[in-house]
A protein has these predicted regions:
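Conserved LRR concave beta-strand detector
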Residues: 72, 83, 91-96, 104, ...
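Residues on the solvent-exposed faces and adjacent turns
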Residues: 99, 109, 130
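Short intrinsically disordered, low-complexity coil segments enriched in acidic
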Residues: 65, 145-149
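N-terminal capping/linker segments that flank leucine-rich repeat
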Residues: 2-94, 111, 132
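Consensus "Asn ladder" position of solenoid repeat domains
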Residues: 78, 100, 118-121, 139-142
Length: 149
């Protein structure tokens, strides 16, 4: 039984190390920056998401990774707040951050992004420059004064 447990620990530890080596560090740092910002409830965004280890992207709830790149973010209705910078996430295909209190989101240069839902936030501007794959955009119930296409 001890051997099985030790082998399992080694295998799982190796998988986490492999993910850390393969992951796009720029994307990880940008997401970590947002996760550490204050949520609408006053604690950190990562706490609202139930994330216990901010240094382990493989365990982040709501983020789907493929080949070390974020391809989907689903953080709908989590009482998140602050500024989410996804600029340059070229593998990202879908984002749903609706029903939060985001004040800014930047998805420019997300060339694979096809679906973006940022409805019911506190956005005053939205930059979706160079998002040629975008076919669905929901941004109603914000405070938009500027939409950059």
């Amino acid at each position: 039984m001890k051997r099985v447990f030790i082998m399992l620990a080694i295998v799982l530890g190796s998988a986490g190390l492999l993910f850390a080596q393969k992951s796009n560090q720029k994307e990880v740092k940008q997401l970590q920056s947002f996760l550490q910002q204050k949520s609408a409830k006053g604690d950190a965004n990562y706490i609202r998401l139930g994330i216990t280890d901010i240094k382990n992207p493989a365990m982040w709830k709501g983020v789907v990774w493929s080949d070390g790149r974020a391809i989907s973010i689903d953080w709908k209705d989590k009482e998140l707040a602050g500024e989410l910078d996804l600029n340059g996430f070229t593998a990202l295909q879908k984002v749903d951050c609706s029903r939060n209190q985001l004040t800014e989101i930047n998805v420019s240069n997300c060339t694979a992004l096809n679906t973006l839902n940022v409805s019911r936030n506190k956005l005053s501007e939205l930059n979706i420059d160079n998002c040629p794959a975008l076919v669905k955009l929901d941004c109603y119930k914000n405070r938009l004064t500027d939409l950059s296409l």
